[in-house]
Design a protein with these regions (language model features):
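Short, flexible, glycine-rich and Lys/Arg-enriched loop motifs at helix boundaries
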Residues: 33-42, 332-340
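Short amphipathic recognition helices of helix-turn-helix/homeodomain-type DNA-binding modules
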Residues: 1-29, 40-144, 428, 446-453
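Short, well-ordered amphipathic alpha-helices
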Residues: 26-34, 196-197
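A general structural signal for alpha-helical elements within enzymatic catalytic domains
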Residues: 31-35, 71, 201, 329
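Charged, solvent-exposed alpha-helical segments that act as regulatory interaction surfaces
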Residues: 39, 75-79, 330-333, 416
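Short amphipathic alpha-helical interaction patches enriched in hydrophobic/aromatic residues
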Residues: 16, 34, 53, 176-179, ...
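Conserved binding/catalytic microenvironments
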Residues: 4, 149-463
Length: 463
């Protein structure tokens, strides 16, 4: 993976400005404090500060010394994360566990965003940890309410700040649907690290404002996790989704919690972990029931049904799908959060088609996959998914020419996207068609897939 350019550090610049401290002044005070503490090896000057402002991460103990110097000048504690520098002692499980205290949630997520911006080895090499998923779901279900979001910093957070986060989240979500997660990930991460982290750490907020801020952060963190998942960065995605769930708990937002748990179930299914997907889906259902949206509950039910299908449990899958259909029949748009607008009859049909595909019921899969194509044209990636799904059903029906015709439509859309999932679904289709390599259309299509799609990203094959 190519290294991203080093990000500048506006937070350090802002703190130096607030403290009225020059580059030379900061360097001199850092050296003096190091000597006073008996740390003789610290050497820095104004050019060192210029490098820090450009995004360089100094080695320990320099970040802690900078924080102490600026804290003394400002008359308040300055944590290392507020400097725009990642603490040097990041734990290997950063972001994998669900915190319950607001201060812990802010510190963990800010450190996660900063480490991701800096492409720290911890996250570049982050693996998906299946054992961490049920623990988060259990904690969501059984823990007492999380602490209320409150900040006492110098920056007043108001309604306009929260609406700005939500507006940008909506814009990013629309772009994600049209372009795929790869093009969006850096933009979303930069906004989280540069702007949202600043509000959380330095903001003054409490009560309803604090809860609304937590909910907005949860929505954006969930989207950040989703685009990382779509980009094939599953270990990073898992950490973002877990922290998004923490923000939903602090906000007391059961609907958002259900959506995030369903997203975690979605990822678990993709990574062939159906047991964990079922557990997460059931936790999501509990949250959805507390909110009261029948549409949201339907989403959580079909995720559970897909988990049963992936385990080849046709009976449990059928029972759960029937419950999902009855639930959706009584759904109304008035019950739904704005971010749930994507879930409609076409989306439900696609989820059902995936269940029947995994159960080996090709005719049912094809019928529902065709229904799924009666969808909103703004969801380009979703259409690519559904076309690949229909093509896969045709392949299972032993109709290789039809599979290649529909698969080529999916391929034409996929090459416009930066979506590891979309590319992998096409490769999976080509793999399923391989036994019919005697058919000219199959040979042509599989060759075109190899030629037009980039090298495979590092992620597991979908079910």
């Amino acid at each position: 993976m190519p290294q991203r350019p080093r990000a500048a550090n506006p937070r350090l610049r802002a703190l130096m400005g607030e403290a009225r401290m020059s580059n030379k002044g900061l360097a001199r005070r850092v050296v003096d404090l190091a000597k006073a503490r008996g740390v003789a090896h610290v050497r820095c000057d104004h050019t060192s500060v210029l490098r820090w402002l450009a995004g360089e991460q100094p080695r320990p103990p320099v970040p802690e010394l900078i924080a102490s110097v600026l804290g003394d000048a400002l008359g308040r504690p300055v944590p290392e994360i507020e400097l725009g520098m990642t603490p040097s002692d990041l734990p290997a499980d950063l972001g994998l566990h669900l915190p319950t205290e607001w201060g812990d949630t802010v510190a963990i997520s800010a450190a996660l965003w900063r480490a991701d911006v800096q492409r720290r080895r911890l996250l570049v090499n982050a693996a998906f940890v299946a054992a961490a998923m049920p623990a988060s779901a259990l904690r969501w279900l059984t823990s007492p309410p999380a602490s209320a979001p409150a900040g006492s910093g110098p920056v007043r957070v108001g309604h306009a700040d929260i609406e700005a986060i939500r507006d940008l989240t909506l814009s990013y979500r629309e772009l994600d649907n049209r372009l795929g997660g790869g093009r969006l990930r850096t933009m979303i991460l930069s906004y989280l690290d540069d702007h949202v982290s600043h509000l959380l750490i330095n903001g003054s907020y409490r009560g309803d404002t604090g809860q609304q801020l937590a909910a907005a952060c949860g929505e954006l963190s969930q989207l950040a996790g989703w685009v990382a998942y779509d980009s094939g960065e599953h270990g990073v995605a898992q950490r973002y989704l877990t922290q998004a769930l923490a923000y939903a708990r602090h906000a007391g937002d059961h609907a958002l919690g259900a959506e995030i748990l369903a997203a975690q179930a979605h990822q678990a299914l993709y990574l062939t972990r159906p047991g964990e997907a079922i557990d997460l889906s059931r936790a999501a259902q509990a949250a959805a029931l507390k909110h009261g949206s029948a549409t949201l509950l339907t989403e959580c039910l079909v995720m559970e049904a897909h988990g049963h299908a992936a385990r080849d449990d046709a009976s449990a899958c059928g029972t759960t799908l029937a419950t999902a259909e009855r639930t959706f029949d009584r759904a109304t748009q008035e019950d739904n959060p704005a971010w749930l607008a994507y879930f409609d009859e076409a989306y439900l049909a696609a989820r059902m088609a995936q269940c029947f595909r995994d159960l080996g019921e090709a005719d049912h899969a094809a019928r529902y996959a065709r229904r799924s194509l009666d969808m909103d044209g703004r969801y380009v990636r979703g259409r690519a998914f559904n076309l690949a799904l229909l093509a896969t059903a045709h392949a299972a029906q032993n109709e290789p020419e039809r599979a290649c015709t529909v698969g080529r439509q999916a391929l034409d859309l996929t090459v416009r996207l930066t979506s590891a999932r979309s590319a992998h679904y096409l490769r999976d289709l080509a793999r399923r068609l391989r036994p019919r390599a005697d058919v000219p259309a199959v040979r042509d299509f599989t060759a075109e897939v190899r030629e037009r799609l980039p090298a495979a990203a590092g992620h597991a094959a979908p079910r």
